[in-house]
């Protein structure tokens, strides 16, 4: 009898040990799983996508834009002849003294279907979208919701890096973050920014200028965190809707898709379509389509103080080499001696803008090529605008 009792006690102890061991192993696995924030976590629909779906419910196509061109004006006739003779494939818009003077398409929006470029054609603006992100950032500064000198981690607590990164360094492309590498695995902006944080800082590039899409993706995420709204909602409520940019849209807005240009490049077999495949992660740095007229409209309204006061606008658009704006680059665009410039290129499309107080020239092409050569010729040689415009070191009121 005594033997049986001892046997039962031993069996009970063994069973208890096994149960405790299994529990500990399960607890450790659970803790490990919870401590890792997955970069590639699947989501049904991002906040940006949800907002755009709701916004576009029942929405019809945008209004049609008419061609604007005066063949009796010698300078616009020269621009037209030059673009035709250079076999330009895209669209142009020129504003003079705040008024649209030329808006015309050349070549094809879709070669396979034979659809021609028109003033209604919308082009993927690529890095020119950083200008809009910069404007949103500037608005938050003026609303005292952010301080440009604060570290990113103040606004995105999990964005921890080996060295502090002020928002200003992201804006100026001197954060030192490793160059962003897009991946089909990243399904939204949040996953892209987590990947950027995980790669961290290149010590050799810290505090040195290195152009990097990743900087503006992180800024887009900061904008979302500070406002509690998606990047897309911020864009529309603070820029797109107030300034009536009705011919601009994010890549996944279905009601606009028939006007989206397809991007191409030439290879050994001829013209090849370049299908955009990572735009869901490019909020803030390259997933908006615009007509050249809408971009010109945006810039002219900024010049007319419809977004910021003169006190903010004039230094923003004219100063460089000053304490406030030591570099030519700021908020997604360049301030240079003879002009202001923004540019973007992605998936065979190039979108370039040159402007001063008199002219805004927007040139968009959808067959990969050198857009800079054409817009320089138009701005410098035809419109004769290669004169001093901004002066280094001069403070502008």
From Swiss-Prot:
GO cellular component term, pick one: plasma membrane
Signal sequence region: 1-27
Compartments where found: Cell membrane
Reactions it catalyzes: [(4-D-Ala)-(2-GlcNAc)-Rib-ol-P]n-[Gro-P]m-beta-D-ManNAc-(1->4)-alpha-D-GlcNAc-P-peptidoglycan + n H2O = [(2-GlcNAc)-Rib-ol-P]n-[Gro-P]m-beta-D-ManNAc-(1->4)-alpha-D-GlcNAc-P-peptidoglycan + n D-alanine
EC number(s) stated in the UniProt entry for this protein: 3.1.1.103
Pfam families, A to Z: Beta-lactamase
UniProt xrefs under PANTHER family: D-ALANYL-D-ALANINE-CARBOXYPEPTIDASE/ENDOPEPTIDASE AMPH, PENICILLIN-BINDING PROTEIN 4
Descriptive protein name: Teichoic acid D-alanine hydrolase
Lineage: Bacteria, Bacillati, Bacillota, Bacilli, Bacillales
């Amino acid at each position: 009898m005594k033997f049986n009792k001892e046997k039962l006690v031993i069996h009970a102890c063994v069973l208890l040990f096994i149960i405790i061991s299994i529990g500990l192993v399960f607890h450790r696995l659970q803790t490990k799983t919870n401590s890792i924030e997955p970069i590639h976590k699947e989501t049904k629909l991002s906040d940006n996508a949800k907002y755009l779906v709701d916004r576009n419910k029942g929405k019809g196509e945008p209004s049609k834009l008419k061609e604007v061109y005066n063949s009796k004006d010698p300078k616009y006739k020269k621009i037209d002849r030059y673009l035709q003779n250079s076999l330009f494939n895209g669209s142009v818009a020129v504003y003079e003294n705040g008024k649209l003077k030329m808006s015309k398409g050349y070549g094809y929006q879709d070669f396979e279907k034979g659809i021609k470029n028109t003033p209604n054609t919308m082009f993927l603006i690529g890095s020119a979208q950083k200008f809009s992100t910069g404007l949103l950032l500037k608005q938050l500064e003026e609303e005292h919701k952010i301080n440009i000198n604060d570290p990113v981690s103040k606004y995105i607590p999990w964005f921890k890096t080996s060295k502090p990164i002020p928002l200003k360094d992201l804006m100026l492309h001197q954060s030192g973050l490793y160059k962003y590498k897009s991946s089909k695995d990243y399904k939204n902006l949040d996953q892209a920014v987590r990947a950027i944080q995980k790669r961290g800082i290149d010590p050799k590039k810290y505090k040195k200028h290195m152009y990097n899409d990743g900087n503006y993706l992180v800024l887009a995420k900061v904008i979302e965190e500070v406002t509690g709204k998606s990047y897309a909602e911020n864009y529309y409520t603070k820029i797109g809707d107030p300034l009536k940019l009705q011919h601009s849209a994010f890549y996944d807005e279905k009601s606009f898709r028939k006007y989206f240009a397809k991007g191409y490049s030439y290879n050994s077999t001829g013209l090849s379509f370049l299908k955009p495949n990572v735009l869901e992660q490019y909020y803030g740095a390259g997933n908006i389509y615009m007509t050249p007229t809408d971009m010109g409209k945006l810039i002219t309204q900024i010049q007319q103080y419809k977004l910021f006061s003169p006190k903010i606008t004039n230094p923003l658009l004219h100063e460089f080499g000053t304490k406030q704006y030591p570099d030519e680059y700021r908020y997604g665009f360049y301030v240079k001696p003879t002009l202001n410039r923004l540019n973007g290129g992605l998936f065979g499309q190039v979108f370039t803008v040159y402007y001063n107080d008199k002219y805004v020239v927007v040139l968009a092409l959808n067959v990969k090529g050198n857009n800079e050569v054409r817009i320089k010729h138009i701005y410098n040689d035809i419109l004769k605008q290669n004169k001093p415009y901004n002066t280094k070191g001069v403070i502008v009121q």
